[in-house]
Amino acid sequence: MRTVVFFILVSIFLVALKPTGTQAQIVDCWETWSRCTKWSQGGTGTLWKSCNDRCKELGRKRGQCEEKPSRCPLSKKAWTCICY
């Protein structure tokens, strides 16, 4: 039940984003926040894979969360999954 509520809240938040140019901004926010932010970690394993698992799925050796400039227009910096 907790996962369902979390998914609904994240979905509402993403729908509420009004892209100024393209739908890519919503995707950028999703990719930025979906694996590495503390408030979104509840979805890891259910809604999306962990950073390390996602990177391995992409054929990389490992992945880790690092603070980087954000691609999402709603924040300047964000914890983002980086694959190695």
From Swiss-Prot:
UniProt modified residues of type Pyrrolidone carboxylic acid: 25
UniProt GO BP: defense response to bacterium; innate immune response
Gene3D superfamilies the UniProt entry points to: 3.30.30.100
Pfam families: Macin
Cellular component GO terms, alphabetical: extracellular region; membrane; other organism cell membrane
InterPro entries linked to this entry: Macin (IPR029230), Macin_sf (IPR038456)
Cellular compartment(s): Secreted; Target cell membrane
Keywords: Antibiotic, Antimicrobial, Disulfide bond, Immunity, Innate immunity, Membrane, Pyrrolidone carboxylic acid, Secreted, Signal, Target cell membrane, Target membrane
Primary localization class, coarse: secreted
Known tissue expression: Expressed in the endodermal epithelium.
Disulfide bridge map: 29-72, 36-65, 51-81, 55-83
Entry keyword annotation includes Ligase: no
Residues in the signal sequence: 1-24
Record function comment: Cationic antimicrobial peptide potently active against Gram-positive and Gram-negative bacteria including multi-resistant human pathogenic strains. Is not active against the Gram-positive Coccus species, Gram-negative non-fermentation species and against the fungus C.albicans. It leads to aggregation of bacteria as an initial step of its bactericidal mechanism. Aggregated cells are connected via electron-dense contacts and adopt a thorn apple-like morphology. Hydramycin contains a belt of positively charged residues that separate two hydrophobic areas.
Protein name in the entry: Hydramacin-1
Organism: Hydra vulgaris
Organism placement in taxonomy: Eukaryota, Metazoa, Cnidaria, Hydrozoa, Hydroidolina
